[in-house]
């Protein structure tokens, strides 16, 4: 485990419950050449309660835009929007580093409806 991956200080269950992590389906994906680090712009459908949200994800080593449309992803939907260059990212799409340090997306391993909350 690298120093960047070291465990963070303990959090309470109440802290965890403040983070709203939902399942969504990528409906659009496009290159994001204006980003400082290689990234892909995502448009994600989180169902009728949350709706469509945008995200920038640094996932170009493992994915191309055409492979992402239709893919289920997990994202934090209640962080404030963040300006990434000329793009406003509305959710934080979740991923983990593989053995080569490349980010791979966190996805449900079987069907989950759009908008489903992580428990």
Language-model segments: residues:
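Phosphate-backbone binding interfaces of nucleic-acid-interacting proteins
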Residues: 1-119
